[in-house]
Amino acid sequence: VTTAKALAWTNDCALVGVPTASCLATQAVAECGLRNEVEVIFDAGRGELYAVTASLLEDNLIWTISQGTLRTPNEWRETLPPNALVTGPGLATQHDSIQQLVDAPGTLEVPTSAAWYPRARTASAIGLAAFEKGRLTSPAQLTPSYLRASYAEDRSRP
């Protein structure tokens, strides 16, 4: 994010922010078929998952991303809707429990592990689509999303 902002300020141009969850949702539907929603999880460390829902807005590329939540793996699995399409790097830490859910008919669908991580080709396609629709972000407005303080920040507090 910092490099993109510096380049945009230096060249006096706007940016297009592409959420990682949008990238992963696009890849999941490309592999598994169109869905209106995709559940995306990331490993949040400390035994938790960061979960968001990507809802299709337009063009199979532009997604609305829900407010993320931190959940234990059990809490996350309990909130999955039936027949959910699930993706994201958090699946790598949940392999055994996800496999049990995938094996049960009508529970959820998971793309191959190659689709769990964002690809530059997908990010650029989403970025171009957003640019063509005028969905630009000023460098000052583009910020990464942090859910909590790092381990170091937690330890530095009294």
Where are these regions (language model features)?
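Short Gly/Thr/Asp-enriched flexible loops that form oxyanion-binding sites at enzyme active sites
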Residues: 1-13, 99-100
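Surface "functional belts" at beta-alpha junctions
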Residues: 13-118, 132, 146, 151-156
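Flexible, glycine/charged-enriched surface loops at secondary-structure junctions
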Residues: 136-140
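Active-site glycine/GP-rich loop and adjacent strand/helix microenvironment
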Residues: 124
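Short, hydrophobic alpha-helical segments
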Residues: 127-135
